[in-house]
């Protein structure tokens, strides 16, 4: 049994506690939360820390499989430039090297106080590491193919990987890569498969301006790249609308849908999407956005629209670290009016809800085992994080 206290505790599900105490058992499960009303007395065995205690972080978007690309991709090349660089490097690393980088990335996230991850996969190379990890993983099995004749084959390949992941007793679901990389037929197969399910799915959304141009009038660098690679492509045929408004009807609305990046999502897009489904979660990976497109989403508009926001790190191919705190620092720097309590909510309970893990993670509540992070070097009076703020994993 441990008794843990700090200047402030942010349970997330309830108001902050000044000099509060969290009691946990040997498994990390919370057995008691004490509101001292700020009057902390000497208690035998009490651990006191300077800073703010928050629940373990939830990383709702990552690509562990791309960890071997750290430092290998040039920044600010735009999405098409990023994709082309990956294509050139993909076959230059062997399985042992890739697994080693995945294992190191997993440990790195644990060190950064991350307790759950929504991880994009294209094969089963990460499964052994995930089985041994302390992190709770939900693997999103990507499907993509813009040739309608190969739609069923592509989906069947996803089903095979899904079967293997489930046999390893890990959480997983099939998920579309991006609106520009699936044929209309593959989208239909995907939607029909999840029509009667209540799962979690994910899709890269409006990561570049070229994505919107592609759907609005078949122009831009992305359209050009697809033309050069494929003689014809059968993507969603709805023209004259933004990307999101063109394809959203193919997303299964009774499932949690994680829309990733949203760098070029407009206010009209948000309204349109929120009217379509109540189960949308908008994932921001700000450091990756700056690395690839050198642009951030209009996060303040999402806040004003009361959208459900979560935080991701993306991969080490487009990020120097896999740290939720570093993502929050970037958001706080560019959007200083967003309160600390809101940022922590996005990084914890919202992510847990998005991945359907809120029963055990995301907030300090009796019976949960959410992990306990200490944020050090934070202004206790203003609750502002800064470039020197850092994470210490307490439990």
What residue ranges belong to the model's regions?
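Active-site glycine- and acidic-residue-rich loops that bind
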Residues: 175-189, 205, 261-264, 290-293
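Active-site gating loops and adjacent loop-to-helix segments of metal-dependent hydrolytic enzymes
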Residues: 68-100, 138-144, 209-254
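Alpha-helical scaffold segments that flank or form the walls of functional sites
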Residues: 23, 52-53, 70-134, 154-167
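Active-site gating/metal-coordination segments in enzymes
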Residues: 157-200
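His/Asp/Glu-enriched, well-ordered alpha-helical/loop segment
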Residues: 224, 250-253, 285-286, 295-377
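Hydrophobic faces of well-ordered beta-strands that scaffold small-molecule active sites
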Residues: 56-60, 117-118, 137-141, 172-176, ...
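Active-site microenvironment of metallo-dependent hydrolases
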Residues: 1-20, 306, 348-395
């Amino acid at each position: 049994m441990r008794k843990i206290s700090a200047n402030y505790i942010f349970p997330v599900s309830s108001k902050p506690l000044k000099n509060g105490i969290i009691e946990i058992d040997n498994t990390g499960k919370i057995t008691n939360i004490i509101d001292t009303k700020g009057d902390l007395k000497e208690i035998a065995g009490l651990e006191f820390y300077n800073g703010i205690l928050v629940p373990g972080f939830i990383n709702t978007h990552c690509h562990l499989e791309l960890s071997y690309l750290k430092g290998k991709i040039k920044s600010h090349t735009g999405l098409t430039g990023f994709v082309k660089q990956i294509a050139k490097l993909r076959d230059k690393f062997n399985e042992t090297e890739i697994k080693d980088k995945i294992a190191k990335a997993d440990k790195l996230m644990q060190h950064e106080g991350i307790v759950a991850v929504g991880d994009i996969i294209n094969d089963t190379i990460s499964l052994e590491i995930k089985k041994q990890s302390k992190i709770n993983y939900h693997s999103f099995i990507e499907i993509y193919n813009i040739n309608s004749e190969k739609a069923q084959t592509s989906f069947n390949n996803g089903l095979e990987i899904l079967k293997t992941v489930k046999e390893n007793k890990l959480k997983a679901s099939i998920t579309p890569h991006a609106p520009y990389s699936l044929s209309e037929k593959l989208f239909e197969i995907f939607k029909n498969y999840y029509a009667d399910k209540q799962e979690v799915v994910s899709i890269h959304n409006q990561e570049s301006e070229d994505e919107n141009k592609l759907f609005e009038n078949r122009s831009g660098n992305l359209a050009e790249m697809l033309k050069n690679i494929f003689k014809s492509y059968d993507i969603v045929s709805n023209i004259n609308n933004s990307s999101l408004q063109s394809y959203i009807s193919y997303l299964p609305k009774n499932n949690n849908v994680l829309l990733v990046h949203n760098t070029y999502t407009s206010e009209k897009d948000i309204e349109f999407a929120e009217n379509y489904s109540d189960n949308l979660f908008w994932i921001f990976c700000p450091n990756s956005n700056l690395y690839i497109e050198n642009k951030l989403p209009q996060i303040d508009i999402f806040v004003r629209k009361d959208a459900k926001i979560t935080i991701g790190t993306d991969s080490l191919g487009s990020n120097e670290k896999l740290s939720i705190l570093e993502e929050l620092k970037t958001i706080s720097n560019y959007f200083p009016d967003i309160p600390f309590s809101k940022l922590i909510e996005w990084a914890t309970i919202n992510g847990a809800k998005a991945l359907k893990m809120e029963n055990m993670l995301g907030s300090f509540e009796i019976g949960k085992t959410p992990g306990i992070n200490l944020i050090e070097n934070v202004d206790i009076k203003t609750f502002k994080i800064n470039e020197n703020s850092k994470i210490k994993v307490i439990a």
